[in-house]
UniProtKB/Swiss-Prot annotation:
Keywords: Cell membrane, Exocytosis, Membrane, Repeat
Residue ranges annotated for the RabBD domain, each copy included: 1-57
Biased composition (Basic and acidic residues): 82-99, 194-205, 524-537
CDD domains (alphabetical): C2B_SLP_1-2-3-4
Keyword match Phosphoprotein: no
Localization terms from the record: Cell membrane
Biological process annotations from GO: exocytosis; intracellular protein transport
One of the record's GO molecular function terms: small GTPase binding
Main subcellular location of this protein, as a coarse class: membrane
Organism of derivation: Bos taurus
Protein name, entry field: Synaptotagmin-like protein 2
Composition bias, Low complexity: 125-138, 603-613
Length: 943
């Protein structure tokens, strides 16, 4: 069933016309099918022509026979849940009416059950005024739908009720049972849930009597079928718990939200006003959890081990305990982990019912402790737990925002105490069930509570006020599926929801103070739930997370530290651009290159972060970067790798058997360990097709792989290739650091020598010089440049100009994927490699001579900046999710220096230098040229 409560009456009428048309078509189709046996004698042909095969296949696949028209028709009867204001107005209106209407004052049916008492429609007599009170929306629609619904039911293929088969009165209960229920004054709408709650407690007989008296009148409002015998309302799944009418009267004057200090003399727990606004698809999931929590005592006692397992599963998915001022709790049943405390009522949390949670539910402890059960590391609490006696109550409901000390007292992993007093005796059955299994539960919970860490040690950066806004990601995923999500999914959702800090290459900064801070911190950011919450907190001024680049609060002149600028000019991998260099992440039209502002910004060349990207990045991304660039980071290359290669003629495959590595460099200097993996290429195939990788072996310098990497390739082609094996460290943010490589020339390899098929140790080496590629295979680019000085005299700020780059077309681009090519051009003004400064053209496919005719504009240029900057134009072949580098240009003065520091990207050729000089000398004039594309080689760091 779908949620159509938002539709207006006009829209509902339009849909009803469509449904009526559908019913008419069904009648015509049924008439045609009825006459088919007279014309068609073959059973198989008759089955195909009548459409019977389709309904049988659908029933086998979906296990039901519900039709789309029925789903829409029933969904339109769904009633929008009332909010607090509407419900209070309805109470006042009903109080002025007859006693019959006042009986229903607290029987607020959920939208999933709306209209149940009026089924079946085709047998319903004209509704009485009292029945319209139960569901005014559905009775208004029934008049226009009655004839349509009668004719829409196919006699040959009866359709089941979309709610549930148990809702039809004739499915499971005999007529005798219905009459007995009518005599007793109890309808099926409430009987199931009442029996589930009161089956084990004799003290609840008074409550049952009150409910029976209350429900005698609603029974009379149910219209009987035309045959004359009384009917019982269909029995829904036991999802909600109905309370006594006295509760709402008492709570009308109480503060909202409900206080935790409800006394034991309270007659009943009020129903939560704000219900879960979910579609009916989540109704089944709530029903499942309802059955888990409120099964009969005898069944639960016999399955003690099952209870233990269920609570263990819940423990990994429970969030922090809801705050006192939240309207409704989370959906989970919470038990106390303390052995000297019996678990309180599991049916009520904060005096509300199971299955509800507030629309305004807030993750109040966003900066507090997370569930330590989700982590792989054990954090021991050096101090005795402060939660052995439960959390203190909040005695005031007038202050919606708790104090800082109250915020810093969440329940930790494994202990979920229920501290509020039981507000009713209605749920003693559940408490009895919990008590009998408390030994097993408490043992499990106590062992789990040892994993928790003192929250006082974690909340050093807690903000003074916690958020009142609901956590959409956690709430939505609670609404969704029938099963609780796994701990892995919870970690992924939290890590995706929080703001991910930027991470740079390890030890890239020359600032020794930052390195000292790095060494004093834990590393496993993702695997620790404690660090998950720390990522949401404001960072401590005395420490920083390893690998997270910190920016000084005061602007730092980038020229005061030439050594830093040298390091920035060193080759670093393109994973600072998310490694894939996807086109979707680039800025297509922004072109603000404010050099004067850039030189004074904290995110200048002195700050190497993944967002600013102020490094000498090559234009080769991802896989190609590992082939055509220098060393990544400043990790020492050492150790060796053991592998063997063989060509299997029968399979026409090259097999690379990677055995192990030893004595690798430690990417984590403090713990002296790395997370290495091996990556292989067949050069010069630089794309994804030529790359193979092993699994990542965690926390070792001597990894053992024993994996075979296979290449499907002809032997003659293989003899023209080179095999490149490189070892990489993969950190927790999935960024790579180079640990060494080995390269074999397969052209001179002796494939017949058996010694070459044996495992051998090869020492790891630094990156070799990139493979030279023929310039004539790169193609050419036709472009024009123009420098426009800013003609705005009289401004206080120095005037700045613009550089216009007109990319016209490319000629004779190489084909790396056979006959397929989908090229585009990307432009960057070095030394700024941030995403905001990058622009690109559209992709032109199916041609080696693409015409772009795209102009890119960069502003903020002063005359002196023209001698220090360089325009980098790169051509890419876009294929699925990857971009393959084709060639590029670097247009500048080619001095090898930028702002007084030697850099490797200032390597323009004579033709490129000539074009740049003409542009500078001839402002406001387009300077055209056709330049050959080249492989942008990355030089080593300058000393």
């Amino acid at each position: 069933m779908i949620d159509l409560s938002f539709l207006t009456e006009e829209e509902q009428e339009a849909i009803m016309k469509v449904l009526q048309r559908d019913a008419a078509l069904k009648r015509a189709e049924e008439e045609r099918v009825r006459h088919l046996p007279e014309k068609v004698k073959d059973d198989q042909q008759l089955k195909n022509m009548s459409g019977q095969w389709f309904y049988e296949a659908k029933a086998k696949r979906h296990r039901d026979r519900i039709h789309g028209a029925d789903i829409i028709r029933v969904s339109m009867r769904k009633k929008r849940p009332q909010v607090a204001d509407e419900q209070s107005k309805d109470r006042a209106n009903r109080a002025k009416e007859s006693w019959v209407n006042n009986v229903h004052k607290d029987a607020f049916l959920p939208p999933e059950l709306t209209g149940v008492v009026e089924e079946p429609e085709e047998d319903v007599a004209p509704a009485s005024p009292s029945s319209s009170v139960v569901n005014p929306v559905s009775t208004m629609i029934d008049a226009s739908q009655e004839n349509t619904r009668k004719s829409a039911i196919s006699p040959a293929k009866p359709r089941k009720n979309p709610f549930n088969s148990s809702m039809l009165p004739e499915d499971h209960l005999s007529q005798q049972t219905k009459n007995e229920q009518s005599k007793n004054g109890k309808t099926g709408l409430f009987q199931t849930s009442k029996e589930g709650e009161l089956s084990e407690s004799k003290e609840e007989s008074s409550i049952l009597d009150i409910s029976s008296q209350k429900l005698e009148k609603p029974k009379q409002t149910l219209p009987g079928p035309e045959s004359g015998f009384p009917i019982k309302a269909p029995v829904p799944k036991p999802r909600k718990m109905i309370y006594k009418s006295q509760d709402l009267k008492q709570d009308d004057n109480q503060p909202f939200p409900r206080q935790r200090t409800d006394s034991l003399t309270t007659r009943g727990a009020p129903r939560g006003i704000l219900k879960r606004n979910s579609s009916s698809s989540s109704t089944d999931s709530e029903t499942v959890r309802f059955h888990q929590n409120f099964e009969p005592k005898s069944k639960i006692v016999s399955l003690g081990l099952t209870i233990h397992e269920r609570i263990s599963e819940k423990e990994h998915s429970l969030e922090d305990d809801s705050p006192s001022n939240s309207l409704e709790p989370l959906k989970h049943v919470r038990f106390s982990a303390v052995k000297d405390e019996l678990p309180q009522s599991s049916g009520l949390v904060h005096g509300r019912e199971v299955g509800e949670f507030s629309v305004l539910e807030s993750d109040r402890l966003k900066n507090g402790t997370e569930d330590a059960g989700l982590t792989d590391e054990v954090w021991n609490d050096p101090q005795p737990s402060q939660y052995t006696n439960g959390l203190p109550f909040q005695s005031s409901a007038s202050s919606p925002s708790p104090s800082k000390n109250e915020t810093s007292q969440p329940t930790t992993s494994g202990s979920f105490p229920i501290n509020e007093h039981p507000s009713s005796k209605e749920f003693l059955t559940t408490r009895a069930q919990s008590t009998e299994n408390s030994h097993t539960i408490n043992e499990h919970k106590t062992s789990s509570s040892e994993l928790s860490k003192n929250p006082a040690d974690e909340l050093s950066c807690t903000e003074p006020e916690s958020s009142q806004v609901p956590d959409c990601s956690s709430r939505d995923h609670q609404q969704g599926s029938e099963e609780e999500p796994s701990p892995v999914l919870k970690i992924l959702e939290r890590s995706a929801a929080r703001k991910m800090p930027s991470k740079s290459l390890e030890d890239i900064s020359s600032d020794s103070s930052n390195q000292a801070k790095v060494d004093n911190l834990p590393e496993e950011l993702v695997r620790s739930a404690e660090d998950d919450q720390k990522a949401d907190q404001e960072p401590d001024t005395n420490e920083c997370i390893p690998g997270i680049s910190t920016v000084s609060s005061q602007p730092d002149n980038q020229f005061s530290h030439p050594d830093k600028l040298k390091r920035m000019s060193k080759s670093v991998p393109a994973f600072l651009q998310d490694e894939s260099d996807d086109r979707e992440t680039d800025t297509a039209s922004e072109g603000s290159y404010q050099l004067s502002r850039h030189k004074k910004s904290p995110s200048s060349l002195t700050n190497l972060s993944s967002n600013s990207g102020m490094t000498s990045l090559s234009s080769v991304s991802g896989s190609v970067m590992s082939v055509y660039s220098g060393d990544f980071g400043n990790l020492e290359v050492k150790g060796s790798i053991q592998f063997a290669i063989d060509y299997v003629d029968s399979l026409k495959e090259l097999h690379v058997f990677v055995a192990q590595c030893k004595d690798l460099a430690a990417a984590d200097i403090k713990k002296q360990r790395s997370d290495p993996y091996v990556k292989t290429y067949l050069l010069p195939d630089k794309g994804k097709m030529g790359k193979k990788k092993t699994l990542v072996v965690k926390k070792t310098l001597n990894p053992v792989y024993n994996e075979i990497l296979r290449y499907k390739i002809n032997k003659q082609i293989l003899k023209t290739q080179k095999l490149n094996l490189s070892v990489w460290h993969r950190d927790t943010f999935k960024r790579n650091s180079f640990l060494g490589e080995v390269e074999l020339d397969l052209e001179t390899w002796d494939w017949d020598n058996k010694q070459n098929k044996q495992l051998k140790w090869y020492p790891l080496k630094r990156k070799t010089a990139p493979v030279p590629l023929e310039a004539e295979n790169r193609g050419e680019m036709k472009l024009a440049l123009q420098y426009v000085p800013e003609p705005v005299p009289g401004k206080k700020l120095p005037t700045t100009g613009e550089v216009h780059i007109w990319v016209k077309e490319c000629l004779d681009l190489p084909l790396l994927r056979g006959s397929h090519l989908n090229s585009f051009v990307k432009c960057t003004i070095l030394p700024d490699t941030s995403r905001k400064s990058r622009q690109k053209t559209r992709a032109v496919g199916k041609t080696t001579n693409p015409v772009f005719n795209h102009t890119m504009v960069y502003d903020g240029f002063r005359p002196e900046d023209l001698t220090e900057a360089c325009v980098e134009l790169t051509v890419w072949d876009h294929y699925k999710l990857t971009n393959q580098f084709l060639g590029g240009l670097r247009i500048g003065f080619g001095t090898g220096k930028s702002y007084g520091t030697e850099v490797d990207w200032m390597d323009s050729t004579s033709e490129e230098v000539a074009l740049w000089e003409k542009m500078v000398k001839s402002p406001n004039t387009w300077i055209e040229a056709i330049l050959p594309l080249r492989m942008l080689l990355i030089a080593k760091i300058s000393k």
